Amino acid sequence: NTHLRLEADNFNLDGFDVAPGKKSKALVMTFKRPEEVVGNHIAKYQALRLSKMLMAYDFDRKLCAFAELGGFIFTFMGDGKPGTGKTTLIQMMAGMIDGYCKVAGYPFRYQNLGIDTVDSYQGKSGQNAKSFITSVMDPAVIGFGTIDDIDQVAGKRGERGSSAGQQEITAVLMEAFAGANTVVRGNCTFGMFSNYPENVDDALRQRAG
């Protein structure tokens, strides 16, 4: 939070949050090298390919050649039984992009939308999800956003077990991934991961890839 004091008026301003994306923290994460990821060679190859695609982003034009010509993967879903390496794949891909960005001198931003995003206050969950999307899609950075255990974070519409907060997140993600105002510049990608993809809202699952 920001604290300001206007001496002339003897007036304090407290509690203003810095706008999302304006203040970046150093990425602290356990990275995995590609040679440490054994098995699941198709998913591994696709993750490596996507990491390289992101490096084709032109910061002057604010557009990636793959997004312009086709073939860019803006959203994807990784599913599988527990222990099949979904988190390892995230660590490998984030590590590859981070390494490439360091060599190229590009700013890299990684964020995860976790279960702690779901809030009991009306509208707050959707606001948290929107902040996550805005931060990752910032055209001034290379972004990688993940939604781990998306079946717990985003709720199925019309299902009695889904909270209002989960449904807000579903609505925000659907609008961001394939809404009327969605602009795919090719500077970022979003990965959704779940052990139970059948529990994810059908329309949201269809937006993966």
Task: Identify the residue ranges that each predicted region occupies.
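Substrate-gripping "pore-loop 1 plus following alpha2 helix"
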Residues: 125-131, 158-188
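A short helix-turn-beta junction within AAA+ P-loop NTPase domains corresponding to the substrate/partner-engaging
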Residues: 202-209
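Interdomain "pre-motor" coupling segment immediately N-terminal to P-loop NTPase/helicase cores
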Residues: 1-30
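Walker A/P-loop
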Residues: 68-110, 134-135
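Short glycine-rich substrate-engagement loop in P-loop NTPases that contacts/grips substrate
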Residues: 107-139
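A short beta-strand-to-loop transition that corresponds to the Sensor-1 phosphate-sensing loop
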Residues: 149, 188-197
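Conserved P-loop NTPase "ATPase switch" module shared by AAA+ and STAND
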Residues: 139-165
